[in-house]
Amino acid sequence: KAHAADGVTVREYKLKVNVHLQDPDSLVWTDMQKRGNIFSNTINLGQQKAVVLGDELFVYTSNSTAYKTSTAPDKYNWSKVNVSNLPSDVKLTSAVEYNNALYMVTESKRVFSSTNGGAWTEVTTLGDNVIVLINGFSDRLSGIVEINGKQYFNICKDGKNWEAENTADNLTLEEVPAGFPTENISTTQTNTGNGVEKVGRAGR
């Protein structure tokens, strides 16, 4: 029961408790090297990013090299992917998937996309003021753009154009709060009980 400040009004709530059936301390891990080859013996001290596209898992280790394997447990087998047309200033950790395509941002704030994980092209219509891409939801790609020295949230639905123009005229975008992570990003997407998509984000 919840009692209001007037000491008279009372509202009664019913709680439903769900018990997790999996003991988190007894999760079983599998050494995947026993299931197939590892993707590389090279120690990479630079940026890396793992991202899923369709039924394949890609691991990017540079602007010219990636490795991929099927996400199906019985088809685990890494192969090298020769990456083309990603500039040297690409931020590998910025990679996100949306609408069957991958997207990355560069230090020069440009956006590149790929439908197969190997061949990339610049999405010039998204401009050259993109700070970061936040996440690919079911119906939109969310990101942060810079306008007149300030950062704003924006969304793209067709993979090519922002819904709000990148202009200061009649600006209705929400400004990004101080401290919002834009580098070395990790995200986790979930759905609420009523189907609303939510994303948890960590970075700096």
Task: Say what each PLM segment does.
Residues Q22-D31, P73-K80, G118-E122, K160-A164:
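Beta-strand initiation motifs
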Residues H3-A4, I43-F58, S62-A66, E97-N99, ...:
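Active-site-adjacent structural elements in enzyme catalytic domains
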Residues K1-F39:
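Beta-rich interaction/scaffold domains
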Residues N37-V52, N85-N100, T124-I144, D169-E197:
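Repeated scaffold domains used in trafficking and secretory/extracellular systems
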Residues S62-D74, T106-T115, R140-E163, V196-R204:
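Structural motif
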Residues W29-N37, K49-N85:
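Beta-propeller domains
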Residues K75-E107, F112-S113, W120-T124:
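Blade-loop segments of beta-propeller domains
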